[in-house]
């Protein structure tokens, strides 16, 4: 890469030796994984000795070192999938398997203008920011300020500081979106909320023709109501619905079999595209429905009426505090990385001058 090419946000703290303030994933010989934050003079203790952080600081990624009792540990930076499952959370996160599908199905491209509603703990926001890059825009909407605080801390931890492409608005999407985004100015909309059908009008106004709406929803009743709402709206293509199931495999010589556990249903994804103004939706021909349903039937089994478990304020405050502390450590690690990178570039620039002499 040319020295004149700007480094993308978050890239510099994914390279080089381990630095103070970084999150590091250590794995013992039995495959047990622990994520620690490196600190000068810090120690990781277990019932079988302790590991000094100073032995890792300055070491290359992928180092294997013993603790005081000779137990070996493998040290690596957490991948995205590891980070989002271990980061502080106030709300449930979008699992990596679903985040990957959202990026692909919604065709999130570099420079895209994306609206996201339902930030939660920021797991999906991180994936979206990585996809749009520094010159795109992810405009996130969240109703609860305390959830936004957790997401902000996690995003800054992942990228080593604020991301230039991230904007955050507090409030209901259907009320706030028309005030902050021009009609037809948004490329993609990602909804993770209990009642996405309530936002269809605001979303249709904001989306550019050909833009993509993708919704992450938990139950079949939500999916049914959303799909019927899209069809009645008339400004979207026929919705596509699916779920993603991931099954690992155990491989040891010729002993090859599926794992005993798998990541099965987490949510459904519903995808549709915005039609041009005035276009008539192509409705697929299908057999007449054998049974009708009422509004009462549709509302009976949505999470808000079944009794969705609420996250306590105490847990949210603790998650926000932890996320803020981790973000501060990550910012320090990023500063060290920038200093090291600047020194390396200066040394590289000085080499041609020395050889010329």
Identify the meaning behind each predicted range.
Residues 135-139:
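Short beta-strand element of Class I
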